[in-house]
């Protein structure tokens, strides 16, 4: 039996020229999740991270607070889908993140505003009608993540490793949970919108089957500082 901890990266730099880097708050979130692992894990886990900068930074900062010597196994299969490309196919302003950020700052409810764009963009992507317009189709992304998860489980069996921590993104974590629970695409992305930065979703791999133990844990962030709860 093995336990897999799926960690969403800390807050990235929304609206900046380079989204793929942690904000100052994101760096703090990563350190807090590292403190949590130091308190709860008795032995160094297998550590895996996507190759995106926000994944690597979150992993490095978390390990600096917990298991300093644990190597990070980098695997691009755990990377998020290209959200800027997917969203810009629906809303061209996503090609100019600084303009989108200005728009968001002007609305009364930024989360609802972005949620509407998110829902429309995802509906278009998962509908398959426009697959030829995307770098990676929804089915391609889903298959990539499910394969990465299965490969990890097989590796845990082969090495008899009891614990693994994977630093990734909300879309990836949603697909993994969807695989375990048998969810369809719309349900999967409903989960995605609720996952907080630096949260932990826990799976158990036992007897060739995956079980969901917890989803979107973030109590350690709230206990440290309620201002650390972010979704964007």
Where are these regions (language model features)?
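Active-site periphery "cap/insert" segments of enzyme catalytic domains
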Residues: 133-155
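Active-site metal-binding loops of divalent metal-dependent hydrolases
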Residues: 10, 170-171, 216-219
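Generic beta-sheet signal
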Residues: 4, 45, 162-168
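Short glycine/proline- and acidic residue-enriched helix-loop micro-motifs
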Residues: 100-140
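Acidic, low-complexity terminal tails and accessory targeting/binding regions
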Residues: 2, 68, 79-109, 139, ...
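Conserved beta-strand termini and adjacent loop/short-helix elements that scaffold enzyme active sites
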Residues: 7, 75-77, 215
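Loop-to-helix element that buttresses phosphate recognition and phosphoryl-transfer chemistry
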Residues: 3-6, 10-62, 137-145
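Phosphate-coordination/substrate-recognition cap region in phosphate-metabolizing enzymes
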Residues: 34-116
């Amino acid at each position: 039996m093995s336990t897999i901890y799926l960690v969403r990266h800390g807050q990235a730099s929304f609206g900046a020229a380079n989204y793929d880097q942690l904000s100052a708050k994101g760096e703090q979130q990563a350190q807090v999740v590292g403190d949590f692992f130091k308190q709860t894990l008795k032995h160094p886990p297998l550590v895996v991270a996507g190759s995106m900068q926000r994944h690597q930074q979150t992993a490095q900062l978390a390990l600096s607070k917990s298991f300093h010597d644990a190597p990070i196994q980098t695997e691009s299969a755990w990377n998020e889908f290209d959200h800027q490309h997917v969203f810009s196919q629906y809303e061209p302003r996503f090609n100019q993140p600084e303009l989108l950020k200005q728009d968001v700052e002007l609305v009364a409810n930024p989360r609802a505003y972005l949620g509407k764009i998110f829902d429309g963009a995802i509906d278009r992507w998962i509908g398959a009608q426009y697959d030829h317009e995307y770098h990676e189709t929804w089915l391609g992304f889903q298959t990539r993540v499910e394969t990465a998860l299965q490969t990890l489980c097989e590796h845990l069996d082969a090495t008899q490793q009891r614990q693994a921590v994977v630093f990734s993104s909300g879309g990836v974590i949603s697909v993994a949970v969807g695989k375990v629970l048998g969810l369809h695409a719309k349900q999967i992305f409903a989960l995605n919108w609720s996952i907080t930065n630096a949260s932990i979703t826990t799976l158990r791999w036992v007897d060739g089957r995956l079980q969901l133990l917890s989803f979107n844990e973030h109590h350690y962030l709230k206990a440290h500082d309620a201002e650390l709860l972010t979704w964007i």
